[in-house]
Amino acid sequence: MTPQLATTICGIALKNPVLAASGTFAYGVEFEKLVDLNALGGFVVKGLSREPIEGNPPPRVFESEAGMINSVGLQNIGVRAFVAEKLPALAGLRTAVFANVFGYCTEDYVEVVRVLNDHAGLAGYELNVSCPNTAHGGIYFSNDPVLLAEVVTAAKRVATRPLIVKLSPNVSAIEPLARVAEESGADALSLVNTVISLAIDARTRRPRIGAGFGGLSGPAIKPIALRFVYQAARAVRIPVIGLGGIATGEDAAEFLIAGASAVEVGTATFWDPRAPLRIAEELGKFLEREGIRKATDLVGTLKF
């Protein structure tokens, strides 16, 4: 019997639990000639801000030993250009499309969500809280429970679609922050974002990234991500979406076992744009080999 991959997140039906992550899948439409977008479990468009952002100086990407470091600087066309130029092409898709939202103050997040509310074609929002709050001395929303509660509460108040809060691994403990996000209105969590890192060129004695520090992603962070997903899933009652170094169907299975209800694939799409589809197929084969009828039967089954 063919295993069932279908699942739901916040009442949103997904064909399978494998989504393309924000930041590596552009606005989705750019991949339509390479990937059957309707076959995806879903995808998250790259982060959207109140106004266009040009991003950081080059070099922006460095390939590390087991992943990559990037500091693109959240370059994007801005939310208004997105709804005018990109969203119309997404509105007819038969898969779940999520908009990643970020800002540098609470009002930024609220305004982006308000603009998106007025347009069809989206299943929900993913709030990237791994950004510095410029009104509070650059403290990251994701690292401060008070700021996290403020931005999630404000976004939830205006959102007309489910709200997923994307948490950072650059914290000492994830459970308190996961609970704050849930108590402030999050409908689901996604984690982890990238790990703040530094790569150095020994010959020039300069960083290999133009902005200095960057975010590490890929296989190197998978064990870190699994730990955080497991801890967050045990701390909250809302669904958790896992990401961080997923490149195979068995990787995806590990995240489900840790407690994730779905997963997102990011860095792997750089060398294989069809990675989310391949991973979903491999997950199905893994379930079949293991005699598991449904992907949902794996969720939260880790044994100690």
UniProtKB/Swiss-Prot annotation:
Binds 1 FMN per subunit. The active site is at 131 (nucleophile). FMN binds at residues 22, 46-47, 100, 128, 166, 192, 218, 244-245, 266-267. Pfam families: DHO_dh. Keywords: Cytoplasm, Flavoprotein, FMN, Oxidoreductase, Pyrimidine biosynthesis. CDD domains: DHOD_1B_like (cd04740). It is found in: Cytoplasm. GO terms for biological process: 'de novo' pyrimidine nucleobase biosynthetic process; 'de novo' UMP biosynthetic process. It comes from the Bacteria. GO terms for molecular function: dihydroorotate dehydrogenase (fumarate) activity. SUPFAM superfamilies: FMN-linked oxidoreductases. The keyword Oxidoreductase applies. Its EC number is 1.3.98.1. Substrate binds at residues 46, 70-74, 128, 193-194. It catalyses: (S)-dihydroorotate + fumarate = orotate + succinate. It is an enzyme of class 1 (oxidoreductase). Its cofactor is FMN. Pathway: Pyrimidine metabolism; UMP biosynthesis via de novo pathway. NCBIfam families: PRK07259.1, pyrD_sub1_fam. Catalyzes the conversion of dihydroorotate to orotate with fumarate as the electron acceptor. Belongs to the dihydroorotate dehydrogenase family. Type 1 subfamily. Homodimer. This is Putative dihydroorotate dehydrogenase A (fumarate). The gene is pyrD.
